[in-house]
Amino acid sequence: VKISGRSATTDVITTPEIDLRAFMRLFPTGVALLTTGSGENASAMTLNSLVSVSLSPPRVLIGVQRSSRTHAVLTREGSFSLNLLAAHQGPLARLFSSRDKPGGADLELYVERHHLHGRPCDVLPGGLAALGCDVEAVFDADDHDLLLGRVRVRVPGASGADPLVFHRGHLGGTVRHG
């Protein structure tokens, strides 16, 4: 393989056991907190599989592992909130990706429940912004489900804060160039 006149490494893996996780660790992504349910049924998880699908009408796509506690609540409730995390919220991202993540009524210690235009939206103080979404469709993706969410509410967050980014297995902020 030639790239810009130089020889590139050709360690090509073509087996079905391709380590997709190793590949995806190289792709920097933003980090979000997904919440769903209320009261004792409330559940949350850290998420970085988030895609903007359309602007009109506003829709997002998320990927949720079927074996997660949050998946069962999410598919039963049919709605969710997404909060984009700021750079200083790395400890929260780690907490909500752990097995000991808070749920039920304890989730109220971290997020504020708002009802805007008749829709619930959990807002994480200090986050970049929040969305309240209704599940419009669920697509089977083997060990995950892809959920298409119709955005019903947007709540602005911390003005001027930098995003939390996940890259190479680490959480951090961004560096601006130029």
Q: Where are the language model's segments positioned?
A:
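Basic, polyanion-binding surface patches
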Residues: 2-178
